[in-house]
């Protein structure tokens, strides 16, 4: 546990948290919406600090990040809690509980970095739950990781305030854009606009950005919803920004909703390509050609993927160009 960052003290021993757009006002002895920040005698503490509930070595493709050091392995970690209440959460067993009410292992930032060194991982991924709610642990670990020549990636719902994001030593982000404003209100108990602002700010800060949209049947799968996300990515983030359409599987409080039809995912991908996006993917469908990276100019297979295994085919890793036609590929290697 350590004192939280980005908060202010108020009268009557209350505090206001400024880590995310909720700006929770927290009374003494209580916690904020995310369960990770507690007011103890008028001081806000990150009570989930170091309570690591999940630690693994993952292919970076699993995040998913397809254009940021493809084929590499990263240390992936999580601490319990979230600042959303998504009805369809795929990781609800750790995200929808306080960090001290689920199994965890006490770890320090130094120990996380030592794991990365031991397993020759070039980077660390803050993922599985919502990293914003364990910001202090992510921040401290990121600083040490960067000092050791490693990169940091954040897999996030994008619900973070501007100043914390600016201060964070993060190199790449996969940001969920879950649907329209109504979807955020009804399904996530959150608002859309701050997520869009995070996407734009991350791009402006020079962070590598990829976007994921989990398509939930009858919730966010109509053409207007898809076009909204496609046009935002194209017009605000750039045609080169990878967009992942992922398949929903029944979980948590939406177990009565069927899996996303593969035809819907293919329709979304084709629509995005028609609207001008250069790199569009289908996720959670093992073996689908929509997992692969193709040259946006000649269509040559650049990176072949099966589940989370990636193999570079017709991509020149020195020049970042297609070996077939010479097209410059937007990728970090």
From Swiss-Prot:
CDD domains tied to this protein: Radical_SAM (cd01335)
Gene3D superfamilies: Aldolase class I
Keyword Protein transport: no
GO molecular function: 4 iron, 4 sulfur cluster binding; catalytic activity; metal ion binding
Source organism per UniProt: Methanocaldococcus jannaschii (strain ATCC 43067 / DSM 2661 / JAL-1 / JCM 10045 / NBRC 100440) (Methanococcus jannaschii)
InterPro entries the record matches: Aldolase_TIM, AmmeMemoSam_rS, Organic_radical-activating, Pyrv-formate_lyase-activ_prd, rSAM
PROSITE patterns for this protein: RADICAL_SAM
Record-given protein name: Uncharacterized protein MJ0808
PANTHER family: PYRUVATE FORMATE-LYASE 1-ACTIVATING ENZYME (PTHR30352:SF5), PYRUVATE FORMATE-LYASE-ACTIVATING ENZYME (PTHR30352)
Cofactor note: Binds 1 [4Fe-4S] cluster. The cluster is coordinated with 3 cysteines and an exchangeable S-adenosyl-L-methionine.
Keywords in alphabetical order: 4Fe-4S, Iron, Iron-sulfur, Metal-binding, S-adenosyl-L-methionine
Cofactor names: [4Fe-4S] cluster
Pfam families: Radical_SAM
Record-annotated Radical SAM core domain positions: 67-274
Binding locations of [4Fe-4S] cluster: 82, 86, 89
């Amino acid at each position: 546990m350590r004192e939280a960052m980005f908060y202010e003290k108020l009268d009557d021993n209350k505090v206001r948290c400024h880590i995310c757009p909720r700006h929770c006002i927290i009374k003494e002895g209580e916690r904020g919406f995310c369960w990770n920040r507690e007011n103890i005698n008028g001081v806000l503490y990150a009570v989930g600090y170091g309570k690591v509930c999940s630690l693994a070595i993952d292919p970076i493709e699993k995040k998913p990040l397809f254009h940021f050091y493809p084929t590499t392995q990263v240390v992936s970690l999580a601490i319990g809690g979230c600042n959303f209440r998504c009805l369809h959460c795929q990781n609800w067993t750790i995200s929808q509980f306080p960090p001290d009410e689920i199994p965890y292992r006490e770890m320090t930032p130094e120990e996380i970095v030592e794991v990365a060194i031991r397993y020759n991982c070039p980077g660390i991924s803050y993922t599985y739950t919502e990293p914003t709610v364990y910001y202090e642990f992510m921040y401290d670990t990121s600083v040490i990781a960067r000092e050791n020549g490693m990169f940091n990636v954040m897999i996030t719902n994008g619900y973070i305030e501007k100043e914390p994001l600016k201060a964070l030593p993060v190199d790449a982000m996969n940001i969920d854009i879950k649907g329209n404003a109504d979807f955020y209100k009804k399904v996530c108990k959150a608002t859309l606009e701050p997520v869009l602002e995070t996407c734009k700010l991350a791009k402006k800060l020079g962070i590598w950005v990829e976007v994921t949209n989990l398509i939930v049947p009858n919730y966010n799968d109509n053409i207007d919803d898809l076009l909204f996300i496609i046009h935002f990515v194209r017009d605000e983030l750039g045609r080169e920004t990878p967009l992942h359409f992922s398949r929903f599987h029944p979980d948590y409080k939406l177990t009565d909703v069927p899996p996303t039809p593969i035809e819907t995912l293919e329709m979304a991908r084709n629509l995005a390509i028609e609207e001008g996006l250069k790199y569009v993917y289908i996720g959670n469908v093992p073996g689908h050609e929509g997992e692969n990276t193709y040259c946006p100019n000649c269509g040559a297979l650049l990176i072949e993927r099966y589940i989370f295994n990636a193999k570079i085919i017709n991509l020149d890793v020195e020049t970042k160009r297609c070996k077939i036609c010479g097209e410059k590929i937007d990728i970090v290697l």
